[in-house]
Amino acid sequence: MEARPQQPLEDRALLAEVARSLVANPVHVRVEEEQRGKTLVLNLYVLPQDRGSVIGKKGQTIHAIRKLFSAIGFKDGREVIVELATD
């Protein structure tokens, strides 16, 4: 199955929207993408004080976000990894 050409932009926009809904400072959410072969890495940047909201209790929130994007990628025959990055 061939991935749609706009898919990485859609993935990046979706991750940004999900993150903005979780944090206290949504204007500071930034997502950068990095292509590694068939793997798309989405680096999510938030303010240090918002990291806990994205990680969640015992890492449950970031785990759920990663599972969601893994499933989205699997559907298109590719791997999508979400990394919580720091500046």
Regions found by a protein language model. Name each.
Residues 55-59:
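Glycine-centered tight-turn and secondary-structure capping sites
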Residues 1-53, 63-87:
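RNA-contacting regions in translation and RNA-metabolism proteins
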